[in-house]
A protein has these predicted regions:
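Conserved beta-strand-loop-beta-strand element in the redox core of flavoprotein oxidoreductases
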Residues: 450-466
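Flavin (FAD/FMN)-binding glycine-rich loop and adjacent Rossmann-like elements that form
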Residues: 361, 465-471, 475-882
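Extracellular glycan-interaction patches encoded by glycine-rich segments
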Residues: 247-283
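Extracellular glycan-interaction surfaces
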Residues: 115-139, 143-149, 158-168, 173-244
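Acidic glycine-/aspartate-rich tracts in secreted/extracellular proteins
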Residues: 99-104, 224-226, 278-285
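Extracytoplasmic low-complexity segments
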Residues: 1, 6-17, 24-30, 34-154, ...
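Conserved N-terminal/central alpha/beta ligand/cofactor-binding core
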Residues: 310-311, 342-343, 347-445, 490, ...
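Beta1/beta-strand and adjacent pyrophosphate-binding region of the FAD-binding site
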Residues: 315-329
Length: 882
């Protein structure tokens, strides 16, 4: 078991977890015998141990009659480590989380249990996994922390509100009888907050228009006699506010209250989720604190998956169903397998490290759901969207483009709920995506797969774990398990074929494109040379030589470019600067963006104002935007990054270097546009960009990646390096030919596992020099009925394409690295399509395990019936005709 260095399924399918010095596994009856110290495999992961600070909180919780859940305690341990790493932990006097499992837990001062614990006065209301409220100024929680415990010129105090109520309210504070002290009103009017910082009441009134929504972290900070600044959700929004009076406090020395303040009849009608009292924290520390403790609070509120970090915990892991990669398909497959009674484990790939990596690309910003027919999105993913719409977004649940789009924050909430077995219908009041026992192990990636005949018996991870399973699922975005299992695979584009596949292979010459001013707009001739007209001067950044591949020939390096799907908002209350502190990011050089300067100059010369839609595709979900490559063709897709990723091959460090280049490209582009002062940049474009901000409620944990806060950590990989290459069946663009395979006709296979509903959409492979002009090579987009599934825009996708040939491997499934042509994959690659196939994959795995047969030998009608009866609110359709 885990206490001996390994993880195996425990009673009732619940993980027995390696909780060194910590709490009991969730759902497992505690045993009176002590937990032995695990013995890690030599060279493998080290034993996990809670920090002493976390142990103190856990001991205090147990003493209060409310032991902490192990999975949630691990998330607290992680938040404390982040706080210590920033230097904020040592400066804090008190840290409270009101969204706890019990009132006894929420009263504990996490920073120093036993000192400044909350005392309940009157009858404030505590709601488990939510927050605290009050109906009267006589009902509150007293911290016991005196005002003078923080220095007049050395303090940071913040409160975390979940409500948008405005009024003459006090969320938290300490005042003497003269009204002097520290207090926070997170929202006084629609545009203002009222705070004081050892000053007379209302002496600070940061009236940034429409900034103060009442929700998020807010509070005053002071580190000198006259300079006070105010922070909202980790971002300084009112810097260096001059105080008209620097007041002193008399002998009363009142204590800080939460849900009110001494000496005032004002109270608050807002719901509060947390607070802290500290010596002065720097702006960087505040941002990190807001991110770390918001992330922890979200786990307390919506769900805390059991997560083992890279190199810590179980040396051996055993489960019936093992999903590799933290993608949405892996989550859905593991979730449904657990729902079907199998023991499961998700094993992180090389790019997976933090909780924000779980769920894959939607967690990393891809939240505007692409589907020609939104109603084709069904099953678990549709239930996730329904839950997000009704519970998290509180909006109408509709099968429309907008109704099926989401925000990374809402999506993360759904993921956390799904992977926490304590999130039952009874506990939450919702029957949607009820939590299952799905542990996650971050590993640094795979290094080997052990085979017995055609069966994978175990896999080995980069951090030295051995994972044994009965059926394996490759949900990674690279297809590494496909490769390591010896399954034939395809890298890059195959040569052109017949019919719709004539658009495959290397597309040059007549198929090359130019930069353009807008979709269908003016095509621009852009010189590719450092000195225009002089090839001897070399090419500008991002332009490569023509590779000399014959038109239609195979293109082994033909991988679509990588991107980062940024999460922006134009709501002022959700503001984090696009280029923080106006400082150039690592690797920045203005010369990298010369191609944009020339595009803008050519547009101006053509009397065209280059619109922001040409630069960036900005799609909205409730005021939060998914930012993608724009209509002008050269945009946030990192130039030629697919070529670099193909060249990186099996090297994880080389892949990470490409990720870093993508981050540098996009963050540098934002800096160049906003701050370089290049005269060629249209003023209107700068003005448009100034209306957007990074959303500080998303992308809260960059881990060790070096990515700044509020930027997505992982790059968007549009296609795997390694696609399954079956001899028996390969889905291709002709399967989507609505002319030769019209609606209602029979597909090549009727063993449907998902439906495809999108255009052939392949982004450019190369930005290159062709005849002294910049050419955009490799792009394909065709949304006609011929190429996108006929009039109904729906194409069935079969079982034979998600399992390898039986001669290669008999216990492996993938709904990501499927057996498909690269061209057809341009339509298949949408997250809902892969997610629905993953749900059926779980039914396939269950059938194969129960009958001890190969995944290729399952009885499809039985699998189909099981998938349709899965209990989803909107069941899968699995149409068997075109």
């Amino acid at each position: 078991n885990a206490s001996m260095g390994g993880w195996q399924p425990g009673s009732a399918g619940v993980a027995i977890q390696a909780s060194m010095g910590g709490g009991q596994p969730d759902g497992v009856t505690p045993t009176p015998t002590p937990t032995p110290t695990p013995t890690p495999t030599p060279g493998g992961p080290t034993a996990f141990a809670f920090q002493s600070e976390t142990q103190n909180v856990m001991s205090a919780s147990t003493a209060a009659g409310s032991p902490m859940r192990d999975a949630l305690a691990r998330r607290m341990d992680y938040a404390i480590r982040r706080s210590k790493a920033s230097g904020a932990w040592g400066r804090k006097l008190a840290r409270y989380v009101f969204s706890a499992d019990s009132e006894a837990q929420q009263q504990i001062n996490i920073r120093n249990p036993g000192t400044y614990n909350l005392t309940k006065v009157g009858t404030p209301t505590f709601t488990a996994n939510d927050g605290i409220t009050t109906a009267a100024n006589t009902s509150y929680y007293d911290t016991g922390c005196p005002l003078t415990a923080v220095g007049r010129d050395d303090h940071s105090v913040e409160v975390y509100s979940l409500s948008a109520t405005a009024g003459t309210l006090i969320d938290m504070g300490a005042r003497d009888s003269a009204g002097v002290g520290i207090s926070i009103n997170s929202k006084a009017t629609s545009a203002t907050a009222v705070m004081q910082s050892y000053t007379a009441p209302a002496s600070i009134n940061p009236a940034t228009a429409a900034h103060w929504t009442g929700s998020g972290w807010a509070g005053p900070h002071r580190n000198s006699g006259a300079a006070i600044d105010v922070t909202h959700h980790g971002i300084v929004v009112a810097p260096a506010l001059a105080s008209t009076s620097v007041a002193t406090v008399g002998g009363e020395n009142p204590t800080f209250r939460v849900l009110g303040v001494a000496g005032s009849t004002a109270t608050t009608t807002r719901k509060l989720a947390g607070a802290y009292i500290s010596a002065y924290l720097t702006p960087a520390q505040r941002a990190e604190e807001a991110a770390a403790w918001t992330d922890y609070t979200e786990c307390a509120r919506f769900g805390a998956p059991y997560i083992e970090e890279i190199g810590k915990g179980s040396a051996t892991i055993t489960a019936d169903f093992v999903a590799y990669g933290c993608s949405l398909p892996s989550v859905i497959a593991a979730y449904d397998a657990a729902r079907r009674g199998l023991t499961v484990a998700i094993i992180g790939d090389w790019a997976d490290e933090t909780i924000w990596d779980i769920g894959g690309t939607p967690s990393s910003g891809l939240t505007y759901i692409d589907a020609k027919v939104p109603a084709h999105v069904k099953g678990i993913f549709r239930d996730m969207l329904s839950w997000m719409n009704t519970i998290s977004q509180a909006r109408a649940d509709t099968a429309t483009q907008d109704g099926l789009s989401l925000t990374p924050r809402d999506y993360q909430r759904a993921i956390r709920r799904m992977l926490d077995p304590t999130r039952t219908q009874a506990a939450t009041g919702s029957g949607l995506i009820v939590g299952q026992n799905v542990p996650v192990f971050m590993t640094g990636g795979l290094t080997a797969a052990a085979m017995t005949g055609t069966k994978i018996t175990s896999i080995t991870t980069a951090d030295g774990r051995t994972v044994t399973g009965k059926v394996f699922f490759d949900g990674s975005y690279d297809g590494d398990l496909i490769r390591l299992a010896g399954v034939p695979y395809q890298i890059g584009r195959e040569a052109a074929g017949t019919g719709n596949e004539s658009a495959a292979g290397y597309r040059g010459a007549a198929n090359n494109l130019k930069p353009q001013t807008s979709a269908g707009g003016t095509q621009l001739d852009i010189d590719p040379y450092v000195t225009p007209g002089s090839s001897a001067s070399g090419r500008i950044y991002g332009v490569v030589a023509d590779p000399g591949i014959a038109d239609g020939a195979a293109d082994p390096a033909g991988i679509q470019p990588l991107n980062k799907r940024l999460t922006w908002s134009n709501i002022v209350s959700r503001m984090a600067p696009l280029a923080v502190n106006s400082s150039p990011p690592a690797g920045y050089a203005a010369s990298k963006y010369e191609i944009f300067g020339r595009i803008f100059a050519a547009s101006t010369a053509a009397s065209i104002t280059y619109p922001i839609a040409s630069l960036l595709k900005i799609d909205s979900t409730a005021g939060v935007f998914d930012v993608n490559n724009g209509e002008g063709r050269i945009s946030t897709d990192a130039l030629n990054s697919g070529l670099a990723y193909a060249a990186a091959g099996t090297s994880f460090p080389a892949r990470k270097a490409v990720f870093d280049d993508v981050q540098s490209w996009i963050s540098g582009l934002m800096y160049w546009l906003l701050y370089s002062g290049d005269a060629r940049i249209p003023a209107a474009l700068i003005t448009s960009l100034q209306g957007y901000y990074l959303d500080p409620f998303c992308h809260l944990d960059p881990g060790s990646s070096g990515t700044p806060l509020f930027w997505p950590k992982n790059a968007y990989r549009r296609e795997p390096l390694y696609l399954m290459k079956n001899a028996s069946y390969k889905f291709d663009a002709n399967d989507m030919d609505g002319n030769n395979r019209p609606d209602g006709s029979a597909p090549r296979s009727n063993k449907t596992v998902t439906t495809v509903s999108y255009a052939l959409d392949v982004h450019s492979i190369r930005i290159m020099d062709t005849g002294g002009l910049v050419a955009i090579q490799g792009a394909v987009y065709n949304a006609t009925t011929q190429y996108a599934g006929g009039v109904n825009f729906i194409t069935p996708f079969p079982l034979e394409a998600i399992v390898p040939d039986a001669s290669a491997c008999t216990n492996l499934i993938s709904s990501v690295s499927v057996s498909s042509s690269r061209l057809a994959y341009g339509s298949y690659r949408m997250e809902p399509t892969m997610g629905m196939a993953a749900e059926v994959a779980a039914a396939v795995a269950k059938n194969a395990i129960d009958n001890n047969i190969a995944v290729q030998a399952v009885d499809y009608p039985t699998v189909r019936s099981a998938a349709l009866a899965a209990g989803d609110t909107i069941a899968l359709t699995l149409t068997q005709v075109n």
